[in-house]
Regions:
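Membrane-interface helix-loop-helix modules in multi-pass inner-membrane proteins
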Residues: 101-113
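Active-site loop segments of alpha/beta catalytic cores
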Residues: 1-48, 55-57, 69-74, 90-99, ...
Length: 355
């Protein structure tokens, strides 16, 4: 039977200390879970994307179950798709994890030039996101909204394949998309800050389409860097202090460019398992880093494999001067054995203490 050491801080105290660049007792646990949280409390995957109350309680109760940092977030799935008129497919099959794009709103070059920033109070899932944020505020949690990634959202508007073709053949169209997305994200930020104030905000930039499996570093530099940097800078101008950024997938070649984007004081930067945490530490010495146990191993591996990957992450992450969260390299897959996830928390008990 596992015997855990007595914590000297609550999860809330631990998060506050890290955000204020203070010492903590041990590494905090920060699993990213959407569909997995639904499975933990007996909800369907669709429930946690279409019902903000169910999404909130699934995440909060899963957080309580595993003893994780007090931050839960909600983006409605495929964020940017429905807000601009794209059609989506719900995760109704056994192995689907999240909402996927069915038909992009932008089908032609003419559609790009007609595109306008939607009303952030009424478009798509934004009313549900606002309801979720009001629950965050009610329960004293950090308040979240979407702050990127630029190309991920543009891909939900135009389709990733079409967007990638245009990067080569019609780059002005992609720049137009990125401009619209940037203005959209800033408008969301202004609405959220006007509603709640900036003090408890930790918005989220989620960037899977920016991965080098899809685009080159040169394309990242042209189409993502200036726009994502602008969004983050405007958020800080509104009084936001911290941004959570998930650098998803294989992005080693993009890291020097991501490092040019301000993340906060400090920011929280999460990495896919393709990025070594020691490399991440070198590029983001002043931010909290997070990661990055391989999600596929969490779902299909043995508890011993998950425990060993967690130990390696802890060994590397604990050396990072600005703080570290142990978490998965991306969303925890919905079919993951709960014991495998708990094993990550056990590894923190065994290897994650600072003194």
């Amino acid at each position: 039977v596992a015997q855990f050491r007595q914590d000297r801080m609550t999860e809330r105290e631990r998060l506050e200390a890290l955000l204020n660049r203070q010492q903590v007792d041990r590494v905090a646990f920060f699993p990213i879970h959407g569909s997995f949280a639904a499975a933990m409390v007996g909800y369907s995957k669709v429930d946690v994307y279409e019902n903000p109350e169910m999404a909130f309680w699934a995440r909060l109760r899963t957080q309580e179950m595993f003893g994780q940092v007090e931050r839960v977030s909600y983006s409605g799935g495929a964020f940017g798709a429905r807000e601009f008129g794209s059609e989506v497919k719900m995760p109704t099959s056994e192995y689907s994890m999240t909402i996927s794009l069915l038909k992009a709103a932008v089908q032609s070059e003419e559609d790009v030039w007609k595109l306008k920033v939607p009303d952030v109070k009424t478009a798509g899932v934004l009313p549900m996101m606002m309801r979720f944020s009001k629950l965050q505020a009610e329960y004293g949690l950090p308040i979240s909204f979407n702050s990127g990634g630029i190309l991920t959202i543009a891909g939900y508007i135009a389709g990733v394949e079409r967007m990638c073709r245009w990067m080569i053949r019609r780059p002005e169209l992609v720049h137009k998309l990125c401009r619209i997305v940037t203005d959209f994200l800033v408008a969301i930020a202004e609405y959220w800050v006007e509603t709640f104030g900036p003090e408890r905000m930790i918005p989220g930039t989620l960037a899977p389409t920016e991965a080098n499996q899809i685009i080159s570093p040169k394309q990242f530099e042209e189409f993502c860097l200036p726009y994502q940097k602008e969004v983050h800078e405007k958020l800080f101008g509104l009084g936001v202090k911290h941004i959570f950024t998930h650098v998803c997938g294989e992005q080693n070649l993009n890291l020097p460019l991501w490092a040019q984007i301000p993340m906060g004081d400090p920011g929280i930067v999460s990495f896919g398992n393709e990025v070594d945490l020691e490399t991440a530490s070198k590029y983001f010495p002043n931010d909290i880093i997070m990661g990055n146990v391989e999600p596929a191993v969490i779902q299909t591996g043995t508890p011993e494999q998950v425990y060993e990957l967690s130990r390696i992450c802890l060994q590397k992450g604990k050396k990072h001067p600005s703080g570290f969260f142990l978490g998965p390299g991306c969303d925890i897959p919905p079919k993951s054995p709960p014991y495998n996830v708990w094993t990550m928390r056990k590894a923190i008990n065994d290897f994650g203490w600072y003194n």
